[in-house]
Design a protein with these regions (language model features):
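Conserved core of the PLP fold type I
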Residues: 52-176, 187-205
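N-terminal small-domain helix-loop-helix segment of the aminotransferase-like
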Residues: 2-86, 91
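PLP-dependent aminotransferase class I/II
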Residues: 208-285, 289-292
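Conserved PLP-binding catalytic core of the aspartate aminotransferase-like
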Residues: 273-274, 278, 282-317, 333
Length: 355
């Protein structure tokens, strides 16, 4: 090809999603096993009547519904909507970082942080995890005059860990106020006390804090792509400036609004996942696996160099999990019968490999 492309794209990997294998148990993408919440199907059907029209690019009705959901301290001006929270991550990089700037995050973490930073021409500062958890002290020590943005993935993907709420507060208090801190809470609905942070209070108290959430996970709208950010109005305005118009469809907006009206059902569903998470995690530890206490809808198995064999043998057993090189495996919490199949395989695998 003769067209001249940006040098930042050199070596940039293409994102590889979790595999879908017909007939196999998919525990690779952290999807909920539940369908849409009550009222969502009807909202989607009604929205299809107007698909010949462009959606509301400002997502005004959804922003108003989210502000009401978040509480009386928040108005629509505190909310930005994006095509999944991943697009909002990219928008945050766009509005803060360019060539010569630095973006800090723990590693291993969400796979799209590094390429998003690379495309911007900025430098990714990857701070190693401690005990599979973001090391906030080390991240603070990594702050320089070039730091523009810090991502705190909480719960962290793929390790399913959270930072202690008081430690997060101290960290935010210590970071210079001109540096934006993004708390990425894609899995926050699965966190339970005492590890549940009051991230919205951190937004209220600090104009340099933004919280990212999504409808893809607990709400079960992964196929519709809706996420949102909560932050200071000036920050929200900047996010809107780099938002690609019309990317959140009318159907997606309608489904998200309807989902907010099903809070009781959402809690019942997440409680069911949390119970299964505890069962799966305990059974894996009893079988001889090591794993940090999970706080999301998945479990992290730090298998090291044994990772490829586990993944291959799981695939042979018609179970698809998510590998991370030779670091470990992320296993989503599925339906009880899916989890039972995983546990049978895992017990057999560890017995054979450690015999």
């Amino acid at each position: 090809m003769t067209a001249r492309l940006r040098p930042e794209l050199a070596g940039l990997p293409v994102y590889v999603p979790g595999k879908t294998v017909p007939g196999a148990i998919k525990l690779a993408s952290n999807e909920t096993v539940f369908g849409p919440l009550p009222g969502v199907r009807e909202a989607i059907e009604r929205a299809t009547d107007a698909v010949n029209r462009y959606p509301d690019s400002g997502c005004m009705e959804l922003k108003a519904a989210l502000a009401k959901h978040l509480g009386s301290d928040f108005a629509p001006e505190h909310v930005a909507v994006g095509c999944g929270s991943v697009s909002l991550c990219q928008q945050l990089v766009q509005i803060t970082a360019s060539v010569g700037d630095e973006v800090i995050f723990g590693w291993r973490s969400f796979e799209l942080y590094p390429p998003q930073v690379q495309v911007a021409g900025a430098t990714a500062i990857q701070v190693p995890l401690t005990n599979h958890t973001f090391d906030l002290a080390a991240m603070l020590a990594s702050v320089t005059g070039r730091t523009r943005l810090i991502f705190v993935c909480n719960p962290n993907n793929p390790t399913s860990t959270v930072v202690a709420p008081d430690a997060l507060t101290r960290f935010i208090d210590a970071v210079p106020p001109h540096i934006l801190i993004a708390i990425d809470e894609a899995y926050i609905e699965y966190v339970r006390e005492p590890m549940l942070p009051d991230s919205l209070e951190l937004v209220r108290a600090h104009s340099n804090v933004v919280v990212l959430r999504t409808f893809s996970k607990a709400y079960g709208l992964a196929g519709l792509r809706v996420g949102y950010a909560v932050g200071h109005p000036e920050l929200i305005t900047a996010l809107n400036q780099v938002y690609v118009p019309f990317t959140v469809t009318a159907i997606s907006q309608a489904a998200a609004i309807a989902s907010l009206d099903a809070a009781d059902e959402l809690l019942a569903r997440t409680d069911a996942v949390v119970a299964e998470r505890a069962r799966v995690s305990a059974a894996l530890r009893a079988a001889g696996f090591t794993s940090p206490p999970p706080q999301a809808n998945f479990v992290w198995l730090p298998l090291g160099p044994r990772t490829p064999d586990f993944v291959t043998q799981a695939a042979n057993a018609r179970i698809v999990v998510r590998p991370y090189g030779t670091e470990g495996v992320r296993v989503s919490v599925g339906a009880p019968e899916e989890n039972d199949a995983l546990l049978r395989f895992a017990r057999d695998w560890i017995t054979r490999t450690e015999a």
